[in-house]
Amino acid sequence: MDGIKLVNVSKFYTVEKESIKVLNGIDLNIPANKITVILGRSGCGKTTLLRLVSGLEEFDQGEILGTNSKRKAYVFQEDRLMPWLDVKKNITFGIHNKNIDNRKIDRIIETVGLKKFYSAYPRQLSGGMKQRVSIARAFAYDPDFIMMDEPFSALDFFTREQMQNELLKIHQTSKCSILFVTHSIDEALILGDKIVILEKGVIKSQYEIKEKSSTRDLLDDKFVKLKKQIIDDLKVI
């Protein structure tokens, strides 16, 4: 499967009759079968970029190549579950193929730690469990490409770490492409095969990480230096 390519993509919003450029001339290659992380501060255009690639919004200039033939799924910051459906029915909701592979669904449910909550309803789940359902639903759709908009930002540190590990585990078996938005540098370093720094609607820098996620040590000199460089890129004081 080929990746996705953005060529000179710009997006404008009109606020009180004034045109504001939210994204400005974005050139970006999103590689296939990898996790590409978009990192930046609030208001830099991360979510807008995600929505353009997903097709939820239209861009005003440029081209986005390679999306038409791809099956896409989206994981939002909030869970967006159906309160009247149990865990399994929420996960299979929207899968129109009547020949659902129940063994595959069961494997996904087990991978994200929901085996004991198979028949539970959203009101019975914690925030972390609800996001597990959202992620399982995205992968159950068997997509080529998943967009994730800060899906772990509302979780506590320990749950967030668990979710990162579970995402990496399930990605290993699916090998789909993921475009992941975050404002956490550590999260970007843990998850990203490619890290894209976005600032005020433009790409400031890009980094590729060759090490497997399972072997990364953020206290290693290489990652300490990379984190410092990213902090400098973001002008974080």
Identify the meaning behind each predicted range.
Residues 54:
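Helix-to-loop junction immediately C-terminal to a conserved catalytic motif
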Residues 100-117, 169:
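Conserved ABC ATPase "signature" region
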Residues 121-125, 129:
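Conserved ABC ATPase signature
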Residues 140-144:
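A short, proline-enriched helix->beta-strand linker immediately N-terminal to the Walker B motif
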Residues 146-149:
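Catalytic Walker B motif of ABC-type/P-loop ATPase nucleotide-binding domains
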